[in-house]
UniProtKB/Swiss-Prot annotation:
Belongs to the FlgA family. SMART domains: SAF. Residues 1-26 form the signal peptide. This is Flagella basal body P-ring formation protein FlgA. It comes from Yersinia enterocolitica. It is found in: Periplasm. Keywords: Bacterial flagellum biogenesis, Periplasm, Signal. Its main location: periplasm. GO terms for biological process: bacterial-type flagellum assembly. NCBIfam families: flgA_cterm. One of its GO terms (cellular component) is periplasmic space. Involved in the assembly process of the P-ring formation. It may associate with FlgF on the rod constituting a structure essential for the P-ring assembly or may act as a modulator protein for the P-ring assembly. InterPro entries: Flag_basal_body_FlgA_C (IPR017585), Flagellar_FlgA (IPR039246), FlgA_N (IPR041231), SAF (IPR013974).
Amino acid sequence: MNRNGVITCALGGLLLSQAATHQAMAADLSVQVNQFFQQQYPDKESQVKVVIKTPQNQWPQCDMPEITLPANARPWGNISLSVRCDGVRRFIQTQVQVSGHYAVAARQLAAGEKMTLQDIKMKQGRLDTLPPGALLEPNFAQGAVSLRQINAGQPLTRNMLRRLWIIKAGQDVQVLALGEGFNVNSNGKAMNNAAIQDNVRVRMASGQIVSGTVADDGTVHILL
């Protein structure tokens, strides 16, 4: 083989090596970005799929990229993700698809109706396609009043509902401490407004401050 042939082979080998290295790092970044978003949804019921929309040749290349979400970023949908490599920060455009449970109306509700647990149904589906403020659990809707007509099967959102304070700050409340095999009743004074299933702080007669959950009947439950 002549000298030119040797140089050509060496150059070709170098380019192949660089391409392989880039592909490996790109694959690593894709895995790391997916793992980053998986950690945002630790519950086993949520399924996360991340599509990186930025062309692969524009991805930063380093072994340990520092990945962060911008402040006030939505947890799904189109997200501009900050990736810092060797002190240089780039933004990678991603589409985060999340499937999980969300709350829908179990029946048609008229404006002004108070919702009970029987009016709420949990459904499995894509969370990133839901309207803003969609409810991922029923607690917020329980005991709330609908601000407009809600159709059966319609996803529930925060701006559809007005929560009713079942406990108001300064109100005397009954506190029920629930232990294994025993219950203890006592009284205290609520320190904040709270709706059903909200957390509320209570100052007891002794001066001690405890936190509990508001039950349907307005009592405060504390698990021991």
